[in-house]
């Protein structure tokens, strides 16, 4: 475990893990919630997210990252900044839940991704629904999705659903066991 990876893990444990009954965005109930917005929007932790996810995806060739708004937005931004700090150009994009009815009426916002290799990111996924929605939109925009990457995997089948449904690798930085949530 790199120092950065260990530091982010501790930040997640300290700031993002909330115990108690909660209803997840998927509609499922859980005995805990990992509120990763407390990490991805935190001035101390967010830069670590970018570094850890860049390391996680280091073996992949891609030049843009993004996913379904809102969970993916700060993840993609942190990766963009971490890449710049390493002297690497990496663009970010945002996938809207539905296309805008005005302006350019785009569903995928940001630099053009048509013809580009991209990684779809998410903070965490329970059912795989948000990343799969993003993969579909990104493919419709003409990009090649090389992987889906998340910060935390809840071990609830999202990875399998993404691999089977989208046919791309599913990567995650931390499993729920590392967070002491077994």
From Swiss-Prot:
In terms of InterPro entries, this protein maps to:
OPRT, Or_phspho_trans_dom, PRibTrfase_dom, PRTase-like
The UniProt catalytic activity note for this protein reads: orotidine 5'-phosphate + diphosphate = orotate + 5-phospho-alpha-D-ribose 1-diphosphate
Instruction: Give one GO biological process term.
Output: UMP biosynthetic process
Top-level enzyme category:
transferase
Chain residues that bind 5-phospho-alpha-D-ribose 1-diphosphate: 96-97, 100, 102, 122-130
SUPFAM superfamilies found in the cross-reference section? PRTase-like (SSF53271)
Which Gene Ontology molecular-function terms are recorded?
magnesium ion binding; orotate phosphoribosyltransferase activity
Quick check: keyword Iron in the entry? no
The pathway to which it is assigned is: Pyrimidine metabolism; UMP biosynthesis via de novo pathway; UMP from orotate: step 1/2
Instruction: List, separated by semicolons, the cofactors it needs.
Output: Mg(2+)
Q: What is its EC number?
A: 2.4.2.10
Q: Which UniProt keywords apply?
A: Glycosyltransferase, Magnesium, Pyrimidine biosynthesis, Transferase
Which residues of the sequence carry a binding annotation for orotate? 126, 154
Q: Which family does it belong to?
A: Belongs to the purine/pyrimidine phosphoribosyltransferase family. PyrE subfamily.
Return the PANTHER family for the record. OROTATE PHOSPHORIBOSYLTRANSFERASE, URIDINE 5'-MONOPHOSPHATE SYNTHASE
Subunit structure, as described in the record: Homodimer.
Protein task:
Catalyzes the transfer of a ribosyl phosphate group from 5-phosphoribose 1-diphosphate to orotate, leading to the formation of orotidine monophosphate (OMP).
State what protein this is by name: Orotate phosphoribosyltransferase
Report which gene this protein is encoded by: pyrE
